[in-house]
Amino acid sequence: MDYGPFFDQLSKGEVIAPLPSLTLSAADNTFYRAVTGDQHLLAANSDLYRRVSGGSKELVNPGLIMQISIGQTTNATRKAIANLYYRSVEILRPVEVGETLSTSTVVLGLRDASPKADLNRGKVWLGIETRSGEEMIARYERVALLPCAGDAPGHSDEIPG
């Protein structure tokens, strides 16, 4: 099993190999609601969603869309010491049951961080896009703190936030 890269194994502009796509079901929506208690009105009431939006199916909870998208990027950060923040989060349109999501991740920047207990580490800035077919449905940025396998590589990109 691949446990993800160390900080010093990444390079700016690198595209991280994607994880498998996921087709969303009504059961996914129901399970997400049961686990989180999220009462998003239009995701909970498909009749109301269809009347309000003109959609033809059931709305997938936007929170679930983000959770799936984040989960599809964990191959870049499996070794993360910390997920520092997300920024510029956009969900661009409603997603309905039956759509298949795939997520791509690119390294936007790298910056060495201060060592802690003799462990070299660094911040990785990721650009993330989630699509249904060819259509982008979500995009955002994520910054995580990763350990180095060896010496600090000397990255000094400006990372926002």
Positions of PLM-derived features:
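HotDog/MaoC-like acyl-thioester-processing domains
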Residues: 1-14, 91, 96-99, 104-161
